[in-house]
């Protein structure tokens, strides 16, 4: 069962994708580690180095030494006296075993090349056949200026119209005028047709006062 499991793991698409991502992560880790080492530790410092602490104290180094020796000894004893229940199949090919170290070496080479390109300026070789079509042939006067000009003009018109409509009309004098006209119309409609009732009540009040005095 375990012998038949190894080929299925090596040939499955999911496991292949996981292995590829792992190898890419290994290469990237080696790349940025080497670049960090070259750019930070291998260069000249701008300020003189200053050591502000002393790590040669035996009270610090002795516990770390005992911990390291104890871990090495305990690991050797455990792996020597406790054997696995089933022997794992050793059917990995050579390229699979050495893939991690190969990707690490590839990442180191890539980091060194990037560092060399950072400190060395390379000029691209000009191609005279591309000068007419890319520089002054038709791109700038026909395409670049046309679309940019139309886009900027539309944005300017929209912005100006919105500012004029919102601040100068709706919230400015025209907005106040519309508000006052609406209030005047509402007040006028409330008093429309009531003049007869007012005159009638006034005349009736005068008549009652005359009758009461006589």
UniProtKB/Swiss-Prot annotation:
GO terms under cellular component: mitochondrial inner membrane
Entry's localization field: Mitochondrion inner membrane
Segments passing through the bilayer: 14-34, 58-78, 92-112, 192-212
Annotated source species: Anser caerulescens
Domain of life: Eukaryota
Gene it is expressed from: MT-ND5
Name assigned to this protein: NADH-ubiquinone oxidoreductase chain 5
Single GO biological process annotation from the record: electron transport coupled proton transport
General function of this protein: Core subunit of the mitochondrial membrane respiratory chain NADH dehydrogenase (Complex I) that is believed to belong to the minimal assembly required for catalysis. Complex I functions in the transfer of electrons from NADH to the respiratory chain. The immediate electron acceptor for the enzyme is believed to be ubiquinone.
């Amino acid at each position: 069962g375990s012998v038949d499991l190894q080929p299925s793991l090596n040939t499955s698409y999911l496991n292949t994708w996981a292995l590829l991502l792992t190898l890419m992560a290994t290469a990237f880790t080696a790349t940025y580690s080497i670049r960090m080492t070259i750019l930070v530790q291998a260069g000249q410092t701008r300020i003189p180095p200053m050591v502000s602490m002393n790590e040669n104290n035996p009270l610090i180094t002795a516990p770390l030494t005992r911990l390291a020796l104890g871990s090495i000894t305990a690991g050797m004893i455990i792996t020597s006296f406790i054997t696995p229940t089933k022997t794992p199949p050793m059917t990995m090919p050579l390229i699979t075993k050495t893939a991690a170290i190969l990707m690490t070496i590839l990442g180191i080479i890539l980091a060194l090349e990037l560092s060399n390109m950072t400190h060395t300026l390379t000029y691209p070789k000009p191609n005279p056949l591309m000068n007419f079509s890319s520089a002054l042939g038709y791109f700038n006067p026909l395409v670049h200026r046309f679309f940019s000009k139309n886009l900027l003009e539309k944005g300017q018109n929209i912005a100006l119209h919105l500012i004029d409509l919102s601040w100068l009309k709706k919230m400015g004098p025209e907005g106040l005028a519309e508000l006052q006209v609406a209030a005047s119309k509402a007040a006028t409609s409330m008093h429309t047709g009531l003049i007869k009732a007012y005159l009638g009540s006034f005349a009736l009040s005068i008549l009652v006062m005359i009758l009461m005095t006589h």
